[in-house]
């Protein structure tokens, strides 16, 4: 998400040749954008129908690519401040899903699908949760 691996390069070779980070150049603004994009993926993962899958490191925004760079050691300690913020936000999303019958069992009802916006409802037993994904601003809302 942060551009550490270019679309036109061999991602497998890149993983062998250098360490893949969140961004290629360590630019703080690009890194923040990458974390926001990754968070949108977690929001989608935790609000669409089905069983969410949080894979090794997803909960704190672990960077990676294809083999051999897709299996970093799991961090249980020593997270950066931004990784800890990301982890806390994912924990809040998981807790919200656990406490929301519409997000667990609800029917998926698309409301708006556009180039940079996706709005859908999850409805169960008269209760509705609305999820808005805003790609243009890398933002979301869950009501």
Residue ranges and their predicted role:
Residues 1-143:
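Active-site and adjacent substrate-binding regions of carbohydrate-active enzymes
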């Amino acid at each position: 998400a942060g551009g550490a691996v270019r679309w036109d390069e061999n991602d497998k070779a890149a993983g062998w040749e250098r360490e893949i980070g969140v961004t290629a150049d360590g630019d703080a603004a690009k890194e923040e954008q990458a974390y926001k994009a990754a968070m949108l993926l977690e929001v989608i993962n935790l609000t669409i129908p089905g069983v969410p899958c949080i894979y090794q490191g997803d909960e704190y925004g672990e960077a990676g690519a294809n083999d051999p760079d897709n299996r970093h050691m799991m961090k249980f300690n020593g997270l950066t401040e931004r990784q800890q913020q990301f982890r806390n936000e994912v924990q809040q999303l998981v807790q919200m899903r656990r406490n929301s019958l519409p997000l667990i069992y609800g029917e998926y009802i698309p409301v708006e699908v556009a180039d940079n916006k996706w709005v859908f409802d999850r409805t169960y037993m008269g209760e509705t949760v609305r999820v808005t994904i805003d790609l243009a601003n890398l933002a979301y809302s869950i009501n």
